């Protein structure tokens, strides 16, 4: 670095030849060069710079406008979605209420059906019991009748002898003959 500054210092020892020469004062030359460059840039670059800034401004404004439009569209879609959600919630509540009432109706129908079935089974049971009681009563009657008949036959057989038996048969034959004559 020291060599670079020494070379600039050695340039300062050259003799100046009239009005043109090297200005070795770095600070003075930089300021002059900078002011010339800035002046040229401002004079010629003013239009380009303003065009660039205008283009950039338009792009920013377009981006803002697009963002606003997208935001408004998103808000609109959000409102539509909220409206659909409210509608669906209302329908879901209606389905839930209808479903509960339908379930309640089905439950009552099932209970009624069960009671009817139980009543029918109770009636069948009572009919079966009555039938079995009648059957048992008939069997008891038949048994009593058979025993009474056997007892009567036993009594008759023990009381009847052959002679009494023959007279009873003859009397019955006479009755049958008389009935035959009446019918002829």
Curated annotation (Swiss-Prot):
Q: Molecular function terms in GO for this entry?
A: proton-transporting ATP synthase activity, rotational mechanism
Q: Which residue spans traverse the membrane?
A: 27-49
Q: Tell whether tRNA processing is among the UniProt keywords.
A: no
Say which family it is in: Belongs to the ATPase B chain family.
Upper lineage ranks? Eukaryota, Viridiplantae, Streptophyta, Embryophyta, Tracheophyta
Keyword Plastid recorded:
yes
Give the primary localization class: plastid
What binding partners and quaternary form does the record give? F-type ATPases have 2 components, F(1) - the catalytic core - and F(0) - the membrane proton channel. F(1) has five subunits: alpha(3), beta(3), gamma(1), delta(1), epsilon(1). F(0) has four main subunits: a(1), b(1), b'(1) and c(10-14). The alpha and beta chains form an alternating ring which encloses part of the gamma chain. F(1) is attached to F(0) by a central stalk formed by the gamma and epsilon chains, while a peripheral stalk is formed by the delta, b and b' chains.
Pfam families noted in UniProt: ATP-synt_B
Function of the molecule: F(1)F(0) ATP synthase produces ATP from ADP in the presence of a proton or sodium gradient. F-type ATPases consist of two structural domains, F(1) containing the extramembraneous catalytic core and F(0) containing the membrane proton channel, linked together by a central stalk and a peripheral stalk. During catalysis, ATP synthesis in the catalytic domain of F(1) is coupled via a rotary mechanism of the central stalk subunits to proton translocation.
- Could you tell me where this protein is found in the cell? Plastid, Chloroplast thylakoid membrane
Example GO CC term: the record gives:
proton-transporting ATP synthase complex
Membrane topology term: Single-pass membrane protein
UniProt-recorded name of the protein: ATP synthase subunit b, chloroplastic
| Miscellaneous comment | In plastids the F-type ATPase is also known as CF(1)CF(0).
Q: Which species does this protein come from? A: Helianthus annuus
Provide this UniProt record's keywords sorted from A to Z: ATP synthesis, CF(0), Chloroplast, Hydrogen ion transport, Ion transport, Membrane, Plastid, Thylakoid, Transmembrane, Transmembrane helix, Transport
Domain of life where this protein originates:
Eukaryota
């Amino acid at each position: 670095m020291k060599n670079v500054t020494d070379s600039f210092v050695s340039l300062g020892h050259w003799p100046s030849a009239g009005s043109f020469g090297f200005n070795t004062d770095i600070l003075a030359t930089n300021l002059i060069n900078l002011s010339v460059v800035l002046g040229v840039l401002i004079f010629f670059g003013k239009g380009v710079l303003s065009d660039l800034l205008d283009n950039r401004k338009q792009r920013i404004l377009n981006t803002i406008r697009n963002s606003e439009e997208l935001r408004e569209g998103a808000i609109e879609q959000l409102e539509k979605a909220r409206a659909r959600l409210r509608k669906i919630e209302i329908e879901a509540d209606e389905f839930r209420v209808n479903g509960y009432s339908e379930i309640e109706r089905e439950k009552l129908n099932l209970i009624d059906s069960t009671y009817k079935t139980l009543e029918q089974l109770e009636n069948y049971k009572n009919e079966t019991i009555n039938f079995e009681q009648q059957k048992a009563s008939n069997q008891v009657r038949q048994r009593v009748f058979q025993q009474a008949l056997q007892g009567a036959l036993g009594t008759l057989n023990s009381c009847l002898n052959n002679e009494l038996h023959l007279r009873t048969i003859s009397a019955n034959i006479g009755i049958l003959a008389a009935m035959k004559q009446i019918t002829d």
